[in-house]
């Protein structure tokens, strides 16, 4: 028999890298077509006028203009690009 306890293993000791999510262009900012507006998981913000949605739910500008945050249907947050 061993005279000392063996070192135990642990299931902790790792962490994932930050994914840099969030708003990248704020309300009132001037943007050009293709600029990323928001990186998100799921549709926290929905795409509005002149805004496209990528397969990972990234919202991006389709035209040049000014960013405007708004509500669609009174409850759902959305983002528009105003000319």
Swiss-Prot record:
GO terms for cellular component: chloroplast; mitochondrial large ribosomal subunit. Pfam families: Ribosomal_L27. The keyword Ribonucleoprotein applies. One of its GO terms (biological process) is translation. Gene3D superfamilies: 2.40.50.100. Residues 1-21 are annotated as: Disordered. It is found in: Plastid, Chloroplast. PROSITE patterns: RIBOSOMAL_L27. Keywords: Chloroplast, Plastid, Ribonucleoprotein, Ribosomal protein. Belongs to the bacterial ribosomal protein bL27 family. This is Large ribosomal subunit protein bL27c. It comes from Phaeodactylum tricornutum (strain CCAP 1055/1).
